[in-house]
Amino acid sequence: MTGANRHYVLAAGGTGGHLLPAFALAAELDRRGHHVALITDERGAKIPGKPDFLPAHVIPAGRFGKNPLRWVGGLRAVWKGREMAKRLFESFQPSAVVGFGGYPALPAMLAASREDIPSIIHEQNAVLGRVNRLQAGRVSAIATAYPEIQRLKPKHAEKIHLVGNPVRAGVLSLRDEPFPPFTEDGLLKVLVTGGSQGASVLSQIVPDGLAMLPPALRQRLQVTQQCRPEDLDTVRERYKTHDIPAELGSYFEDMAARLADAHLFIGRAGASTIAELTAVGRPAILVPLPIATDDHQAHNTREVVKAGGARMIRQEKFTPKELAKQIQALGQRPDTLATAAHAAWNCGRPKAVEDLADLVESFGGADMMDVIKVGGNNARAASQGVAVGQGAAKERAE
């Protein structure tokens, strides 16, 4: 979709889960000739991966907890942030504002509503986040990553557009990489990560779980594991004790290539993680973060687990014995992992960033098409499991 150069503002919370999809959209809008600005908080401005062309405007954003005193301070910060966002809008004149959730996105979304600027929210998870729930009734469109979204009211169904989660170009470039050859006597390459901060539970359980595999399978293991820096020495010693070859690190710059080279992934169930797994098509054993808000990581796994592309183990049941059982079931026959990889690949939405950009472009410009076809087939998501009729986003004139 093409058209006159426009200005767009993206607003996202200060974590990679919110910002990485925003960075991907910014790159796509820039490629189409538009001007883009980012609103976030101090944490968000430091997240790696921000495109060089993208200016980051840091504004205050309140945090709210159970303590009423924190609400007072939080509301003051939101009001101050909203006023700062309004001043940015006056000079930048955005055609639309896109929110990716997280409290730092709230002031900008409130300012857009106040100034009658078209706005869109993108929900990365299978449960609508708190800030996006607050804005669902005010925005022009709701872009979702999963066919079914919890905590999204049916009355907002006509706003919903299923686009998927944008992923990095480096990951998308590997979508057509075939599943690595896996034979009955070949290496079983396992990639283990715990998200951007690592996960100590994986460091504690995975080495011992791999050690419980039958000798014929254990001797074929080749492990790559991302750990917290403070866990590296302990985990290295565990693998050495079990005589399992393992490459460990707190950060891998070539993570996308390592994912493409893996036969099996073990890790958390964040939205970006699942989007990348399904983009490349690699089977997984997923351990949802138990303290994730509204248990959204467990909900994130449902589509790919149902399709056969992954297995999910709740953390309270994540023991070395259970992990070994699941790996053995997947790794005993070469075709089992390959079939799971194909199922994961089929869950991928490689055109997510293009479809989201099409949706964003449909607001604020008279030269846009009357109707856009998200995903090529007018894809719609379902709110709270209620099926939503097919349709598309209608043009919004300035």
UniProtKB/Swiss-Prot annotation:
**Reaction catalysis annotation:** di-trans,octa-cis-undecaprenyl diphospho-N-acetyl-alpha-D-muramoyl-L-alanyl-D-glutamyl-meso-2,6-diaminopimeloyl-D-alanyl-D-alanine + UDP-N-acetyl-alpha-D-glucosamine = di-trans,octa-cis-undecaprenyl diphospho-[N-acetyl-alpha-D-glucosaminyl-(1->4)]-N-acetyl-alpha-D-muramoyl-L-alanyl-D-glutamyl-meso-2,6-diaminopimeloyl-D-alanyl-D-alanine + UDP + H(+)
Which ranges form a coiled coil?
none
Q: In which pathway does it act?
A: Cell wall biogenesis; peptidoglycan biosynthesis
Q: Which Pfam families match?
A: Glyco_tran_28_C, Glyco_transf_28
Q: Name one GO biological process term.
A: carbohydrate metabolic process
Instruction: Specify which residues bind UDP-N-acetyl-alpha-D-glucosamine according to the UniProt entry for this protein.
Output: 15-17, 125, 168, 196, 297
What domain of life does the native source organism fall in? Bacteria
Question: Which is an annotated GO molecular function term of this record?
Answer: undecaprenyldiphospho-muramoylpentapeptide beta-N-acetylglucosaminyltransferase activity
Its Gene Ontology cellular component terms are: plasma membrane
Record's keyword terms, sorted: Cell cycle, Cell division, Cell inner membrane, Cell membrane, Cell shape, Cell wall biogenesis/degradation, Glycosyltransferase, Membrane, Peptidoglycan synthesis, Transferase
Write down the EC number: 2.4.1.227
User: What is the annotated localization of this protein?
Assistant: Cell inner membrane
Q: How does it sit in the membrane?
A: Peripheral membrane protein
Which SUPFAM superfamilies does this entry report, sorted A to Z?
Answer: UDP-Glycosyltransferase/glycogen phosphorylase
**Has UniProt tagged this entry with the keyword Cell division?**
yes
Family, according to the entry, reads as follows: Belongs to the glycosyltransferase 28 family. MurG subfamily.
Q: Enumerate the HAMAP family for this protein.
A: MurG
Summarizing the function annotation, the protein's role is: Cell wall formation. Catalyzes the transfer of a GlcNAc subunit on undecaprenyl-pyrophosphoryl-MurNAc-pentapeptide (lipid intermediate I) to form undecaprenyl-pyrophosphoryl-MurNAc-(pentapeptide)GlcNAc (lipid intermediate II).
Q: What is this protein called?
A: UDP-N-acetylglucosamine--N-acetylmuramyl-(pentapeptide) pyrophosphoryl-undecaprenol N-acetylglucosamine transferase
Q: Which gene encodes it?
A: murG
